[in-house]
Amino acid sequence: MATEKGHSRDDEERVPLTRGSTEFRNSIDSFDYSSSTASLSLAVIDRINNSTQDAGLSEKGPRDDDDDRYWDDDVEYDVEDADYIPSGGKPMHKSVKIALWSLLFLSLGGWSLAFVLFIFRSHDTYQTPILSEDNISSGGLRGDRITLDDVLGEEWMPRHHFISWFPGPNGEDGLLLEKDGPGSTGYLRVEDIVSRKDTNSSKGSIVLMQKNTFTVGGETVICSQVWPSPDLKTVLVLSEKKQNWRHSFTGKYWLFDVDTQTGQPLDPAAQDQRIQLASWSHKSDAVVFTRDNNMFLRKLSSKEVITITSDGGVDLLYGVPDWVYEEEVFSGNSATWWAHDGNYIAFLRTNESAVPEYPIQYFVSRPSGEDPNLGEENYPEVREIKYPKAGAPNPIVDLQFYDIRKGEIFSVDVADRFPDDNRLIIEVLWASNGKVLVRETNRESDILIIAAIDVLSRTGKIVRKEDINALDGGWVEPTQSTRFIPADPSNDRPEDGYIDTVIHEGRDQLAYFTPLDNPKPLILTKGHSEVVNSPSGVDLKRGLVYFVVAGNEPWERHVYSVKFDGTALQPVTNVSESSYYDVSFSDGAGYALLNFRGPKVPWQKVISTPANENPFEEIIEQNNHLSRKLRLFSLESKVFQYINIDGFSLPVLERRPPNFDPTKKYPVLFYLYGGPGSQTVDKKFGVDFQSYVASTLGYIVVTVDGRGTGYIGRKSLSLVRGKLGHYEARDQIEVAKKWAAKPYVDESRMAIWGWSYGGFMTLKTIEEDGGRTFQYGMAVAPVTDWRYYDSIYAERYMHTPQHNPQGYDSSAISNTTALANSVRFLVMHGTADDNVHIQNTLTLLDKLDLANVDNYDVHVFPDSNHNINYHNAHKMVYTRLADWLVNAFNGQWLKTNNPTPNDSLFRRVATWAGLYKFKHLC
């Protein structure tokens, strides 16, 4: 799911979005919410004090004039009340009467002045957060507080160098591709990792491009991306890149000759036409590319372009994925695979003719870049995308092959494979001698087959089949991490094979299959730890596999190696420390870029692997700027722990405000994502929105990786299938109850928030909870009914709606009565969200309207996609989250049942002052 692949694949976004320790102030909890029974004078004074405290706050929205909790509405105050004489009583003495009248007028004058000051100094109900002096911890200040701008900008982002390891043309290991670094020579270079430390030596360094610009026929080409050929003689250049969806883009492509430092169009006959994808042959003699959904071949020996397909168009795609395959299967823009010998190309043919379209409207922008027709300037631009929702027709995909020598396309029939309407192709892996492995699943992603195809004989067969639903009730995640292991009799490998991730004893483990058609593997890893996106590297000479595991604790990541026979399991990183690493390996796995991601300040270094006879180490990033900032700022402290719910040990992260005082009462915000296989509780360093909430606003932030999330076992993972939201919401609520019972938690101020799947989980949790534990919720870009989400993702975890209608009904956000029992909730969505359509939010609003539910706020972001970043929207969404949360915990959203007009003198004075203020501001 969207920004969520990052989570499910252990990436940064989160999010999106992805994706420290200790502070100086606590939460804003100085307001007294019991003032409804206080006297008018105390109420006014209290309100003025709070107004003074709020002075300088920016106005965010209209004031709610029905917010009367500072007033005693049971008492009517009128000027005549002071002159009331009981019947039959003695006339009042004149001097006493004068004194009383004087006191009355002084009181009225004071009250009127107080109201005027209140109106002119206070601000709207929608407030910007500030810190109360009452909440400064007794421990004193430990440093500056971070701002929202700090966490939304790049000040706290670790610097991260991306090294592109490059296989040497002559088998060299440890070569890397670098672009325009400090003190470098040339825009694009290939360098030997060992010799580059010697700045006086040019050994092992090849300059491929001196500059990032060149001229072709009078046109200046500016490089957007570059891909050197395997022989390092030519560079494939992309210019004028234009983003399409999350991973796909178009642009102009060029061939740049390294010797002459000159360029030419990839297709000289169509220089200005935009291309969707281009990739090198392993022999460096040709480039295959897709344009207008058709495939073409350019051999470097000729300027002519060979047409491979010609019937591609709106409904038929060749070599590139459609929207749903790009998003949910490949997480990329390519569906083209070169054979190692350069004689064949495998590619997907995608038929979308039966897939329904969904319209994306753009009200402000025109992403097409085209001017509207005359008279249509005031109409929104509409882009129709082929988007298969759950239960709708899927694109039909076929694997086809192109024989370059014969110039023909062919397919290979495989007996007993899935039929067209029940087939997903999720990985294609070339082996040797014309063999290719194809990983397929059924539509619901719970039966896996591996087919072996021989393109030389044009035959194929199924070599492995696994029923995951029967095994543990789970599903198959699409991955592209399988590694081919070629035969090498001199190294005790008589047959070809491959290394894959399999389910073993309830965990994801590595397995070695050899020969290719052997369905019974050798299990390489065992035990409590689970492998993550592995294998990461393979050393064919030494017979070693390198991989990353979620270590002794699920929030850790460590790097290990093991031999092909399953022996000599060794850690590469220091497993005695609770840390989070990731790694990338050189082509021969003799060197590695080791990334320490946390919990301390991240660093990067290039190392030789333990099996390398020539030890090497070079630190390339220490993030000293973050070390300096940590000495100046106060950040939250983090507490990692487990909470047992229904027999499952769930990872929990509690962020505590700096100078945490266990004798105080803190509001609590739960932050979650919670999607299947995802992880949010980890030991990566990060200063994000949650850090701001804990460190600057002074609230406790709790994150729970509940059932269905990753790296806590398949039993927990598979349990959620067919009923998304049920167990996950229960876990959030049960953990929240435990936190509400803690002596340092204010149980009357608890909120929950999330984005995308986390938005769905926010609404599901407050729906299930019905206001008993969580009073507030904030949902960004939420799914509200899985029938509205794309078929491949939704059906993987929910089956089809036809197969599981009750599950879809139960998972949908539909209990409006329960939502009405919360104090208030917030929903935000981008109108141009191509991933989680705004249809989700709009249909929920319709349900709320029909049920007369109004305890919510909505913010819609015009033309923003799932990331919500168009026209300042990224900053606005987090500002709104922060301000709304502060108002919630300040009690600004407390409901008033059956509000009635208040026509008292003081309300009239307040109204008059407000009108006066409005008149003069205008």
Swiss-Prot record:
The active site is at residues 756, 833, 866. One of its GO terms (molecular function) is serine-type peptidase activity. It comes from Ajellomyces capsulatus (strain NAm1 / WU24) (Darling's disease fungus). This is Probable dipeptidyl-aminopeptidase B. It is found in: Vacuole membrane. Type IV dipeptidyl-peptidase which removes N-terminal dipeptides sequentially from polypeptides having unsubstituted N-termini provided that the penultimate residue is proline. Belongs to the peptidase S9B family. Pfam families: DPPIV_N, Peptidase_S9. Its EC number is 3.4.14.5. Residues 1-21 are annotated as: Disordered. PANTHER family: DIPEPTIDYL PEPTIDASE 10, ISOFORM B (PTHR11731:SF200), PROTEASE FAMILY S9B,C DIPEPTIDYL-PEPTIDASE IV-RELATED (PTHR11731). It is an enzyme of class 3 (hydrolase). Glycans are attached at residues 135, 200, 351, 574, 815, 902. The keyword Nucleus does not apply. It catalyses: Release of an N-terminal dipeptide, Xaa-Yaa-|-Zaa-, from a polypeptide, preferentially when Yaa is Pro, provided Zaa is neither Pro nor hydroxyproline. Residues 121-922 are vacuolar. GO terms for cellular component: plasma membrane; vacuolar membrane. The chain crosses the membrane at residues 100-120.
